Amino acid sequence: MIVIKDAHFLTSSSQLFQCPASLTSEMVVLGRSNVGKSSFINTLLGKNLAKSSATPGKTRLANFFSTTWEDKENALRATFNVIDLPGFGYAKVSKSLKKEWEGFLWELLSVRVSIKLFIHLVDARHLDLEIDKNAKENIQALLRPDQAYLSLFTKFDKLNKNEQHRLFLNAPKPFLINTAHFNALSSKYPTLEIVRQTLLKHLLTNPL
């Protein structure tokens, strides 16, 4: 069983020089505004670290968290950073600010060698949004051989059982979800433990 032994906030940045040194492997969490990034990060880490804004799209900072994972069964202990990116698809900002902000984010994702895993959160109720398709294409265009891209579906518990099953059959594998009610789901769906194992496996495949 994987246990998160430590998770704490490092810093926020809006420019590259403000980012912490690239000393350990990192996973990036991205998704459109109001997709549930804060909820996913807090569930994953077992701690209320990520804060959501009352106004979707208002936050324009990349937030860095340091985490230590322990897998006792395999005598493994490893430290990774989690980077929480601002939600994309916001509307209430000026064009100049939007351009500046997007420039920082894409530069961060392009040049930071410590990023090993991109986790793209997608609302399970809205699978075919153009904004998510564009984000996926842009991230995959950036991918280096030592990086991986995974989709993870949020708000899975908002679907009825037929919708859950249909998504499970048709979605790319590994099938990963986030919900506040993992224990209430059918046993065929991934648990929080499986989500953690999958992410850890990808982070360890190409260590920094």
Swiss-Prot record:
Mg(2+) binds at S38, T59. Coiled coil: none annotated. InterPro entries: G_ENGB_dom (IPR030393), GTP-bd (IPR006073), GTP-bd_ribosome_bio_YsxC (IPR019987), P-loop_NTPase (IPR027417). Pfam families: MMR_HSR1. CDD domains: YihA_EngB. One of its GO terms (cellular component) is cytosol. GTP binds at residues 31-38, 57-61, 84-87, 154-157, 182-184. Necessary for normal cell division and for the maintenance of normal septation. Belongs to the TRAFAC class TrmE-Era-EngA-EngB-Septin-like GTPase superfamily. EngB GTPase family. This is Probable GTP-binding protein EngB. It comes from Helicobacter pylori (strain ATCC 700392 / 26695) (Campylobacter pylori). The lineage of its organism: Bacteria, Pseudomonadati, Campylobacterota, Epsilonproteobacteria, Campylobacterales. The gene is engB.
